[in-house]
Amino acid sequence: MAAGVVAAGVLSGPAASARPAPEPPLTTMSIKSPPGSADVRVLIYHGSAAGGDESPVVNAGIEAIEDLGQSGPTAGRFKVTATDDASVFTDETELGLYNAVVFLTGGGDVLDPEQEAGLESYMEAGGGFLGIHDAARAEPYSDWFTGLVGARPAASSPTAVQRATVEVGDRQHPATKDLPLQWKRPDKWLNWTKNPSGDVHTVARVRESTYTPGTGANGADHPVSWCRDYDGGRSFYTGMGGTESSYDETEFRSHLRGALAWTSRISQADCKATINANYKAERLTQPNQPGQNDQIGEPHGLVTAPDGRVFYIGRGGADSSQPVITDWNNPDVGKGKGEIHVYDPKTKKVTLAGTLNVFGNKGGGDELIKVEEGLLGIELDPRFEDNGWVYLHYTPHSRIDRDKRMAERYVSRFTYNSATGRLDLNSEKVLLKWPVQIHSCCHAGGGLAWDSKGNLYIATGDNNSSGFSDGYSGNNPQPNYKGVSFADARRTAGNTNNLNGKILRIHPEQDGTYTLPEGNLFTGKETAEGGGKTRGEIYVMGVRNPARISIDKKTDTLYAGWVGPDAGSPSTTWGPAKYDTFAAITKPGNHGWPYCMGNKQPYRDRNLPDPSKPLGWYDCNAPKNESPNNDGLVNLPPVTSNTIWYSPQGGGPDFPRDANGIPSYKTAEQKFLLPWLKGGGQAAMDGPVYRYDANSASAAKWPSYWDGKWFVGDFYDADQPRHAVLLDPKTAGQGGIPVHAESLKKIIPIGNDGIKNLMDWKFGPDGTLYVLDYGRGFFTSDSKSALWQVTYKGGGPTPAADQLVREAQ
């Protein structure tokens, strides 16, 4: 090796802009396409812009890559040539021998313009490139080389070796598939002048909360390894490998081996899946005609049929130009139209399949005027293609009691006639019904979902006012209307004998009845506390307003999200701020509301005669329902910690706890376990778990990278979540928080002209994502209310199968 030293100095993007990028001269090089052969060869270039001895880090890197080439399975081996002579990049014959080029360089100009042009010709011919750590500091004045490596280190990057946690989000790329989900290792961690996420495919990120990133840090989304197809070839870069000891690590060597397998055409990989430009978001429905809901109602849920049609519902709010009736003396008070529309992707047309008269149209205003009831949820029977059965969760207007201000909620089965495109309203079979108070808004829930055993899950809200508790636990027993409490969620969500504030699980039968599957939270036959105090339909209790639920069709795991109360900050008197919540649910349980939130953070109890006075803290491990409005068990199941929770202050707020396990609830002492999200205005919208179908011929399906990732979102589109998260299977459903989160905000576009107010989202059988945008008002539809489709257009993995040098690895 020639004497030299890897430059510790460091030119960053801003400094580089002071000098214009030189125009490389035209080259007459003609490199065979693609370069290399089945006798795989890798070139390590370690040229230096400075004199002196070779860096020990570079020597360690060369030795590690040489060893990788001679070890492991025969099909993955390769030969290595290491050089610091840049003239190789102007020798078309020599350069064309190499399947991949590795840059183990320092900063500065390590290539002259002609040599850089040769490297560019090599990539255009289909070559592979692997840049390691300081390679991102090379060729600082070249825009083309910046694109090749993907990003430039910030001058403020820390120089000390620090131990940190790497989140390995890509579980399929050969460079990462064998690595731990959370990879803890020491290195010199680089900050980037411009975050490359969205322009490259990031396979791993470093978690800034686990080390000191210094000034110019990139935040929760801090890429550390990425790849992309670039200028005809394949480019992989890792910011790791900045220490000599890195190259002794088995897992880091595995990372390099996988990167070289892809860049040298031994293995395929998808390096396009998270590049924003590879997706297209298209509005499918048009604004309604004046005075009509010919395209869409007040958006409230969707489901896709096996043939690709999309069924979506309108809750019942009228077009804003239409009058509403709020006078309880009027028999038509709150009457609205719960509409079922169908979008056919083959004809690209919308039809109105049916309309139900629902209680749900009182417009906006305070909680004694507005209402969230109506047509709340839709699902299709697992054998829909054969029987045409559609299940609707709704509040029929015909069943309201205007005197007592009570209503009934139905889960009904209807038959859809595919030939006429109409729902047969006379075919209704009411499977399940239960009472709800309608004196005060809110929290109706609505989501429906099936598991693989034919069990139907039904999400119900706590049917409780948001007021009278200062935005903390909804546990004020005092307000009532004609004997029915409307501000005490212990009557509903915290009550083992009430179907509100729950996720129910039933098994619909052919005749329109239902049976109870084994394994619900209760059997309904419990004899505790005198008996008759449980409902066997309850699978999950303690949820506030679960508008959306989903079930992973591979694992049968239930996923849910629910909206929290209104307190803007935590209180040392009453407890946590408003937490919107997501939960991965693997077994029946109590998820806390209105006793505990987040990771078992308790509220303060209150009761008669003076609910304004705080009593003791709830015990999340042994909660008691001592409300005068409770007709269920006093002794409740222990609270299960949730997966994601967020407040206006940040994601996953947590506090120091005293000897009794009570958090301090002091704002200055809170830390955030989930720094990638934040609330404010917030309304959690659970999404699907994507499952990639390799047998599907759809060219627009989302890539396999997303397989197994859970989509979590919010009605609002600022700091609130719109992410795909990855859970550790070992802790999912047991209080484990996500190990990785990928922003979707540029794939599912935010903003007024995008999908600003996300209401529901589901993948169709073609692997494309359908999304409902609620619109810009409340309790109405408007010109922005729409059904959207998000499709993938990036193409398949690379290199193409016929360009692999050996049988696919």
PLM features per residue range, with description:
Residues 23-39, 67, 210-212, 216-224, ...:
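Extracellular ligand-binding/catalytic regions of CAZymes and related secreted enzymes
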Residues 405-449:
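Asp-box/WD-like beta-propeller blade repeats and closely related beta-sheet repeat scaffolds
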Residues 304-307, 382-386, 450-453, 552-555, ...:
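Residue-level detector of Asp-centered blade-edge/turn motifs that repeat once per structural unit
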Residues 270-276, 318-338, 364-368, 373-375, ...:
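Beta-propeller domain segments
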Residues 41-138:
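Helical hinge/lid and interdomain linker segments adjacent to catalytic or ligand-binding clefts
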Residues 103, 108-179:
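A glycine-rich, often tryptophan-bearing local segment used as a flexible ligand/cofactor-contacting loop or short
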